[in-house]
Amino acid sequence: MLIKGTAGGPDPTIELSLKDNVDYWVLLDPVKQMLFLNSTGRVLDRDPPMNIHSIVVQVQCINKKVGTVIYHEVRIVVRDRNDNSPTFKHESYYATVNELTPVGTTIFTGFSGDNGATDIDDGPNGQIEYVIQYNPDDPTSNDTFEIPLMLTGNVVLRKRLNYEDKTRYFVIIQANDRAQNLNERRTTTTTLTVDILDGDDLGPMFLPCVLVPNTRDCRPLTYQAAIPELRTPEELNPIIVTPPIQAIDQDRNIQPPSDRPGILYSILVGTPEDYPRFFHMHPRTAELSLLEPVNRDFHQKFDLVIKAEQDNGHPLPAFASLHIEILDENNQSPYFTMSSYQGYILESAPVGATISDSLNLTSPLRIVALDKDIEDVS
C-alpha cells in the first residue's frame, strides 16, 4: 500500500487498521503499510468446497492531525492453480454397436453434459479434452475408434467391424485439462467397453461344415441317398438322406431372436433333367420326398444341386450336392450265356487243376452267368 503519512515512530500522523476482515485471512503491518496472507494452519483454496475467489478487506486510515477517517478497499484476487486432476463421473462406460454400422458413425456420446469428466479447477485448468489411448490388452481398439472432436469426447467408428472376428473392444479414453503449460496438464482415464452386435451379413451354410484351412469357407458337401426302383412314394417317403440335410444361418446371434431369418430349401438344378417329376424338397424342413416310382431301366442315379437361402429378402445362398442312387428291384433271374458247357482235363491232373475249353488244354473253360437286374457277370 502507499498511503500518505506515517503510522510509526515518535510522531505518527496516521493510524491504520483492518475492517471486515472475514476469517482473518489478512494481516496488516501498519508501519510498513504491508498486507500479509494469514494461512497458518490452513490452505487458501479457490476450488470447491472453499471457493475463495477473492478476499476483500477495508483498510481504515485515521488522520491523527485532524481526526478524519478514510476507508481504502483492498481486493485480493485468488488466481487458480492447476492442482486438481479431472475425474470421470463413472468408473467405466458402455456402448453397443452393430457390426454393419458404417465407418464414420458416432457410436458413443456418453460424455455429454456432466456425465463425462469434470475438473474443479478454473479456466483452461478446468476445461476437458478427450483422447483415445493405446490399450496393450486390446491393441486394435485405438485403431478401430477415434475421437475427432476432443472437447466433446464423442467416439466415432474408424474401421469396419466384423462380429465373427471380434465381439468386444476395451477402449481406454484419457481426459486431460487444458493447462497452457503442457507439462503441467493433469490426466485421468476410463474404459469404454464396446460390444459388437451380430449383423445379417452372412448367409446359411450346410452342415456338417468342414472348413478349408485358413478360411471360413466350407469344403464342398455331398449328401447321399439310395432308393429301390419301382417303389411307391407311400413306401419310401420321407427319403432318408445321409447326413440329414440341414443348414444354419452363420449369423448366429442376431438380436432380438425374432429378427433372425429363417432358411428356405430348394432343388436348384440336376441331372437327369426330368428330376422334378420324381423328387420334391420341403422348403422349410429340407425333407426329401418321392413323387412317383423310378424305373432303373431309365434312371440309375440323380445328381442334384440343392440351395439354402434366407427368407428375409437377403438370400445369400449356400449350395450343396445331393446324389441319389437308384437300387435294382431284383426282379430278374440269373441266366447262363450257353445252354451247356464242355470241358477237358488230363486224367493225371491233380486235384484243383484248371479245366480247359479245348483238347489242346490252352485256355480255361469260362462259365458265364448274367443278371439283368445288376447287368454284371457273376
Show the residue positions of the predicted features.
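Extracellular cadherin-type adhesion modules in metazoan precursor proteins
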Residues: 1-378
